[in-house]
Amino acid sequence: MTAIMTQTLGQPVPPFTAHAISVSLPTWRDNVGYEEGEKRVVNSMVTGYPRFFIHKSIQKLASICERKFGSQGERCMLFSSKKTAEFCREFMTNHSPNPQSPVPVRLIEFVVCPDEITAPSDSRCIDLHIVLFPADAFPIAKKFWQHTGMGISSRTAVRCLTRMSDSPTSPTKRDHPPALNRLPSKPQNRHYVVKSPPPIPREEEVEDVNSYLEERYGRNLPLGYAAAAKRALRRRIAGVLVHDQCNNIQDTQRLPEAGGDEAVLGPSSRGVENVTEDDVFLYPTGMSAIWWAHHLALLTRPQQKSVCFGFPYTDSLKILEKWGPGCYHFGHGLDSDIDALEKLLEELSPNHSLSSPPPILILFTEFPSNPLLRSANLPRLRALADKSGFLIVVDETIGNFVNVSVLPYADIVVSSLTKVFSGDSNVMGGSLVLNPNGRHYAALKSTLQKEFDDIYFDEDAIFMERNSRNFRRRVQTINENAEAVCDFLRSFSSSTTGEPPLVKEVYYPKFITRENYDTCRTADLAPNVSAFGGLFSVTFTQLAASHAFFDALECMKGPSLGTSFTLACPYTIIAHYGELDWAGNWGVEKGLVRVSVGTEEKDELLSVFKKALEAAEAAVRTLNA
């Protein structure tokens, strides 16, 4: 169990965390101020959500690269592979303000190597792929960074900063840099820096101390075991580990059972028994897994529009809209939308047969959706996909595979490991799982094996492996806590005293599209076991109640979800501030408060929400006085 935590404006969430995923925005006004660029808020931001706020270590490294390689008036973005950098260049070209004169973009490869190999963690060079462009095109590059989640991680940046000097001069080009057993081929614009470590800046010094402590006291694998950590992650996600108990690792020469050759493997618990670790692919973020699922479909299937089924996380929809031919949006995600989808498919392909091109590329849906927690009728969608030949991609982040089994209905399942799989809110990650029983599995698998770049930074994988060891236990606690809180809040949605209700709606799988959710409930869970996940949203009958409730909540407040501590945000404000009316048309109200419940003591949580409701009631009384 964890204690209820709070944090001041602009500070990392969790506190004192160098690579925190969230940032504290503790009041409604703070969130509005952030969206409006209010100086009071912006100047307080020490960090932010990594795809929206570029971590300061990455900013520092980018500034060095701009001085070393850029021309006057140029800025850059940093990536971990040439392929990703080329994707960025293509996006910037395609989205140039003037198609007749596209933004000039150039790529440089910069290889950062240690001067002396003193530990396994120092044995690998880091390839930086620098995308340089005119400064006024930065917003376009930032959109690519945000939508795809394929930029370098903050740990990558810190590791690079420890291996190079912050010097404005160009690095030395070497044909045979020291400490390299094998010199990679040296194409044009490939540069190397190999230097003895300069005096280490404080942030990087703290990073090295943290890495030492994590390894020395058994919480993390040594960095030399990154391959084993990634193997453990793939097995954990595939659901093939018969025993997945990781104790403290004092013997650093011993691989953990989950990632070692001695691991006992069995049939998958994911609802498709023949899934293996080879069907699981790791990505640096959840959004990059979603981007690659869509890109994989574009590579293997006839070019058609996609379908976004339900109201999804904002960047998921942007991917479907901005890459490929576009998408149809069925934003409510209800059975009535499936009726409309059937009509659309008939209109697009009136005489469709199995030999005909599919009328759409993929159908993407979240199970359940964010933030309305609606669950699609997956069996019915699967039947449509089999009839029409399109792919189904399901994002299981919110349901998670402890609670729900969606793989039998999907061709591809994606997830943000950053969320509840990690729980600690200190590392990013994503996964993509192929269904080996899917009709298009062979084509998807062979193409992905050819196209896949392992750009998940080793240190991030190490932290993700450590964090996820108690994943199942955390989920069980979170399930129970969230159900108790939601039952409590819902009791205020219908009045027993003759007064108007305070709570308008509690969006939670137990209460929303319950039948569809239960259809996919994990088979080995007992009927009386809580399994609805930790996320819910709540709306109030008056906007003043939303403001007061949120401001009075004594918990962490900021973006993200799935944390081991309770985390809340005014979701529509931070995700759709520039399109509030559009979101409202899909039922995502301006006053919606989204809450990700943590592992705190249940009674303590209920007390916190009781106080927040009392504040909401007081605000309404004052308004009506």
Question: What feature does the model see in each segment?
Answer:
Residues G310, E396, Y508-K510, F540, ...:
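Active-site proximal loops enriched in glycine and acidic residues that flank catalytic Cys/His/Asp
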Residues G260-E262:
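N-terminal alpha-helical interaction blocks
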Residues L502, F532, L561-S564, G591:
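A generic structural signal for well-ordered coil/turn residues at beta-strand boundaries
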Residues F452, L553-S564, A612-L623:
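A common structural junction motif
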Residues V209-P222, R236, K445-A548, A552-L553, ...:
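Structural motif of enzymes handling amino- and sulfur-group chemistry
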Residues T2-L255, S268-T276, I290, R301, ...:
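PLP-dependent enzyme catalytic core of the Aspartate aminotransferase-like
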Residues L432, G533-T539, V593-S596:
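Short cationic amphipathic helices and targeting signals
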Residues G266-P501, Y507, L623-A625:
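Conserved PLP-enzyme active-site core in the AAT-like
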